[in-house]
From Swiss-Prot:
It comes from Mycobacterium leprae (strain TN). Residues 15-272 form the Pterin-binding domain. The gene is folP2. Has very low affinity for the DHPS substrate 6-hydroxymethyl-7,8-dihydropterin-pyrophosphate, but can bind the inhibitor dapsone. Seems to lack dihydropteroate synthase activity, and does probably not function in folate metabolism. One of its GO terms (cellular component) is cytosol. SUPFAM superfamilies: Dihydropteroate synthetase-like. One of its GO terms (biological process) is folic acid-containing compound biosynthetic process. Homodimer. It holds the Pfam family Pterin_bind. This is Inactive dihydropteroate synthase 2. NCBIfam families: DHPS (TIGR01496). Coiled coil: none annotated.
Amino acid sequence: MQSMLCGRPVAADRQLIMAIVNRTPDSFYDRGATFSDEAARAAAHRAVAEGADVIDVGGVKAGPGQGVDVDTEIARLVPFIEWLRSAYTDLLISVDTWRAEVARLACTAGADLINDSWGGADPAMHEVAAELGAGLVCSHTGGALPRTRPFRVSYGTTTRGVVDDVIRQVTAAAERAVAAGVTRDSVLVDPTHDFGKNTFHGLLLLRHVDELVKTGWPVLMSLSNKDFVGETLGVGLTERLEGTLAATALAAAAGVRMFRVHEVVATRRVLEMVASIQGTRPPTRTVRGLA
């Protein structure tokens, strides 16, 4: 069963996987493994072969690091997106940027979805998405500026303050996007773990993820190998898969629509198992006790 998202066909009866392809030499997880054109193309081919529904292409490391100006970000993203669109004409392509100028050129090159992971830091982003007919991810950063780390972040005196703030901010941003002309069914919301949040905030958001789902806006979650997973389990960057997948299973069971991931195959298996437990997906084969 298929539906349309940002003008592209996607599965309607299961969660979607957004595979990460970083065009950066210093990304927090892969440390530049897909920075070269050849490596990035190979990663995209692999992700599609493994069942990714969306490819998310970023040109600037999320955290602090070497400065990247607009022209450099454009050079990293636009030619690759042009190639990706020519290679996969029906694939949903996402661009991860907080700069409206970059988003404009990326969408002109073939991107369908703007993953504005720094929560509207550029106020022109809604207008660009509307003008170009692109989808938009409305993210929550608690007011943090792009490429900064959280420091003594507070969301009030109640334990669920961050939950209320996330729901209030992302739903308001989604409504502003629609008012600007972005198609309602092309808007997603993202609580944006680790951005303007500490580990306790990340865990609370997962504990109450059903409340975000109940807003009616499709929810995107980027949990993959995040610091809140590492701090919760006391493990390093290369040992966060199990924690990521546990968080993914919980969020999937609550109804999260899309997951932004590094590991496509492992995530797909988790999502399929959750769906089978919930009764929305039949087992692949049933022999035990029947033959």
